[in-house]
């Protein structure tokens, strides 16, 4: 397991002062931020890619390939999302799988992981996407890695009225 932290100026200062050690500097797909982070450690790109919203066909695959090739990003991360109007677990699972198949077709050989998103009262479509059983089914059936965001899991467990450890 590696310890990744969002890159920022305060983090850079802590690294400079030898106050913290991190394995990876987490950056969005922004070239300026990536260049600023490079002198301070290995850069990991945390992509803004969601499965379940039918938008993977609009991704910039040239940018994705370039960033995977030029950074220390071992996996393409995705987020297990949903869109308004999808209330069926089987429909959402099918959409996740379709989006994943599309990504794999565009990026053959790239290892893909999926991250759990938190559900919120103001984003009701994410309640279904945050279901731990549905997430587990997707991970197992599609040979995906899991990027388990513990803060997202805590938020979802509370809103789903579940024990955090069982989530």
Model-based region annotation:
Residues 1-68:
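N-terminal pre-domain/capping segments
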Residues 11-13, 132-133, 146, 164:
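A generic local structural motif
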């Amino acid at each position: 397991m590696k310890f990744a932290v969002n890159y920022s100026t305060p983090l850079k200062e802590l690294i400079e002062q030898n106050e913290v050690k991190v394995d990876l500097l987490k950056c969005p797909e922004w070239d300026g931020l990536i260049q600023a982070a490079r002198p301070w450690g290995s850069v990991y790109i945390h992509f803004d890619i969601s499965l379940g919203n039918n938008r993977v066909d609009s991704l910039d695959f040239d940018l994705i390939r370039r960033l995977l090739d030029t950074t220390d990003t071992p996996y393409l991360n995705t987020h297990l999302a949903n869109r308004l109007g999808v209330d069926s677990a089987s429909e959402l699972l099918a959409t996740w799988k379709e989006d994943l198949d599309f990504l794999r077709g565009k990026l053959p050989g790239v290892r893909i992981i999926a991250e759990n998103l938190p559900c919120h009262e103001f984003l009701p479509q994410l309640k279904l996407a945050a279901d731990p059983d549905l997430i587990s089914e997707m991970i197992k059936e599609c040979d995906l890695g899991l990027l388990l965001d513990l803060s997202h899991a805590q938020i979802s467990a509370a809103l789903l009225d579940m024990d955090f450890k069982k989530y």
